[in-house]
Amino acid sequence: MIIIEVRSMIKKFVTMDGNEAAAHMAYPFTEIAAIYPITPSSPMAGLTDAWSAKGRKNLFGQTVTLTEMQSEAGAIGAVHGALQAGSLSTTYTSSQGLMLMIPVLYRIAGERLPAVLHVASRTVGTHAMSIFGDHSDVMACRETGFALLSTGSVQEVADLAPVAHLAAVKGSIPFLHFFDGFRTSHEINKVDLPDEAAVTALLDKDALKAFRDRALNPEHPTLRNTVQNGDVYFQMREANNGFYNALPDVVEDYMAKISAITGREYHLFNYYGAPDATDVIIAMGSVSSTAREAVDALVAQGRKVGFLQVHLYRPFSMKHFLASLPETVERIAVLDRCKDMGSIGEPLYEDVCTALKGTPITVIGGRYGLSSKDTDPAQIVAVFDNLIAEQPIDGFTIGIVDDVTHLSLPVKPFVSQDPETVQCKFWGLGSYGTVGANHNTVRIINETTPKYAQAYF
């Protein structure tokens, strides 16, 4: 009934960046937000604070209670405490801030509390610090027990951020929703904002009541946070398997409902390209739009290629993954936006290899986009060309010229620009106002014309 009403609604186009999209769609599901700002996630906390101060109501008719802590460790500790008391709690972070949260993430996941973290994923400092985006921070969390949900554009952030909250409550598993720092978090775009009432109506009230009933309460005290010995710890750790096994179907169901509301199709794994593709690239995040652009150009040339975008990375559902691939696929290249030093391959590559164990499909892996290194369609074409080479390079890189270990792929000139698209590049010095002027310009174009304008700084 809700879906029928929503389909008849007029689309609501707004201009915002990825941070605002995440914060806007998270606010209705949040009762307590504990924050500590860190680039590039800070605007999410700032917007939540501003909306709360102005009296914006969540789905329960309350303003969000927001507290800034002394550090990210304090923020996640406050989130943990709020969840134990039966309040839906959210925080926002990146990079080193997320690293400080990891010890508590294990506890929250082990206790199956429906926390939600929205992460503008960013490089973790190694030989040097960097404020720019890749997946190294998120990949450090993949063993915590948090579900990992990836989005690749401002529109996807707006559409799928609610799925993290909805599935966390119904599945009784905490979620970390991540999108690329700066490339998505700070990209301004024209988005069709999902109807808030329709989305919040999807919240499972019975699951919410069950969560509230588990809250610490002196009227019905419970024993928690015990120190266990080997006689019971192993068994109790395995006892959570059923919740993780069921979660992919919970997320897929919510994605189907969001798809019905928005008219945009979402799955755990979204395939794009030739239905009879023999060569497929697998990746997640903002590179997805670049990959689709390259696939369109190559399919138009008669090549049988495709792209598989990963949305739900943890739990990794082999059932949904295998069902998403064309039956004709022979070769796969997996792109990871991180560097796993000392490993035989990066995280997504290793998961794909495990999922395809026993099949004749050739799988190779590569790295791209560390510290927001740009990835263009020509580089994606180079990956497809490498796949069909007589001796393809495994463990390759794109976007750089590797003159040390010689793992970078050669890139040929490739133009795929839509002739109806206008692209402009502006240069300016600090304090000249170039960025501010472009912020205003793109909003004016989006809000006063039927055109779709995108800006990235």
What are the residue ranges of the model-derived segments?
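Core nucleotide-handling region used for phosphoryl-transfer chemistry
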Residues: 301-331
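Conformationally flexible catalytic loops at phosphate/diphosphate-handling active centers
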Residues: 60-64, 175-270
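Peripheral docking tails and interdomain loops at the edges
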Residues: 331-417
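Short helix-loop-beta junction
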Residues: 50-55, 293-307, 357-358, 443-451
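Redox- and metal-dependent alpha/beta enzyme cores, enriched for Fe-S-associated oxidoreductases
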Residues: 275-303, 316-321
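Conserved thiamine diphosphate
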Residues: 131-181, 205, 354, 358-369
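Short beta-strand segments
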Residues: 92-93, 116-120, 150, 176-180, ...
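Thiamine diphosphate
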Residues: 2-140, 145, 162, 392-395, ...
